[in-house]
A protein has these predicted regions:
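Short intrinsically disordered, low-complexity coil segments enriched in acidic
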Residues: 1-12, 16, 116, 120, ...
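Conserved P-loop NTPase-based nucleic-acid remodeling module centered on helicase motor cores
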Residues: 2-66
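Conserved helicase motor core of SF1/SF2 NTP-dependent helicases
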Residues: 15, 143-205
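Accessory N-terminal region flanking or inserted into the helicase ATPase core
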Residues: 51-138, 147-152, 165, 175
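Alpha-helix C-terminal capping segments
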Residues: 2-7, 42-45, 121, 125-129, ...
Length: 205
C-alpha cells in the first residue's frame, strides 16, 4: 500500500514458502487442516488436543500435544520419526509405540478427510515439477528455515538467475520448531559472495 502496489498482481511471488507452495499446488483453505480437525482427530484417538494450528505468518506448527509436535518436528527436520524420538527420549514424556501409531493414524485421518497440513504442502511441492523461473530470488530470515524448507529453497534456487539469501544466525528464534541454523551457516562454503553488514538498520547504533 505504501508504494501503491497490488500484492496479488504486482507482487504475486512475494510470499512465505508455505504460501508459495499453497499457491503453486492450487490448494484452497477448505482443504487445509484446521484446529477443529485436530480436535476431532484427538477425540477419535482418545488423546487431549486443545491447541493445534499452523501460523499463517511463518508456517510454524503450534500444539499443546507433545505427540503432534514431535511428529511435525521430525518431518520438517527430514528425520525418521522413531530415530528422532530415540535421540530425545530422555526429555520426552510420551510413549514410543503410541507416537508411531498416532503418526500413522494422522495420515489416515487426513486422507479420509481429503485434508492437508502446511508440512504436507512443502513435501508435495518437492514432488511437483517446477514451472516458474525467476530472474532474481531473494530469501529473507534464512536462519529460521527448517531442512524441509531448505530443500524447497534449493529447488527454486536451481531455476533462478541470481539468488540473494539474507539472515542472521544470532537472531535464530525457531530452533524449537525445527529451524536448521547450522545449514544456514554452512552456506558460506558454497556461495560466491558473502557480505556482512556491520550496521543493523533494524536496531541502529
Amino acid at each position: 500500500e505504501k508504494f501503491g502496489l497490488d500484492k496479488e498482481n504486482d507482487l504475486p511471488f512475494f510470499r512465505t514458502l508455505h504460501s508459495y507452495a499453497f499457491n503453486q499446488l492450487g490448494m484452497t483453505k477448505e482443504k487445509m487442516m484446521k484446529s477443529e480437525d485436530y480436535k476431532e482427530f484427538g477425540q477419535k484417538c482418545g488423546i487431549p488436543i486443545r491447541t493445534a494450528n499452523y501460523s499463517t505468518e511463518d508456517g510454524t506448527f503450534n500444539s499443546d500435544n507433545e505427540y503432534l509436535t514431535i511428529i511435525n518436528t521430525a518431518r520438517v527436520k527430514r528425520l525418521d520419526l522413531l530415530e528422532y524420538y530415540d535421540s530425545r527420549k530422555n526429555i520426552l514424556d510420551i510413549e514410543r509405540s503410541t507416537l508411531f501409531l498416532l503418526a500413522e493414524e494422522l495420515k489416515r485421518f487426513k486422507k479420509e478427510k481429503g485434508l492437508k497440513d502446511f508440512t504436507d504442502l512443502l513435501e508435495l511441492f518437492l514432488e511437483k515439477e517446477m514451472l516458474n523461473k525467476f530472474e532474481v530470488l531473494f530469501i529473507d530470515e534464512a536462519q529460521d528455515l527448517s531442512l524441509l524448507q531448505w530443500d524447497m529453497v534449493r529447488k527454486i534456487w536451481a531455476r533462478a538467475g541470481k539468488t540473494y539469501i539474507a539472515g542472521d544466525d544470532d537472531q535464530a528464534i525457531f530452533k524449537w520448531a525445527g529451524a536448521d541454523v547450522d545449514h544456514f551457516i554452512a552456506l558460506k562454503e558454497e556461495v560466491d559472495d558473502i557480505q556482512t553488514l556491520n550496521q543493523s538498520y533494524r536496531i541502529p547504533g
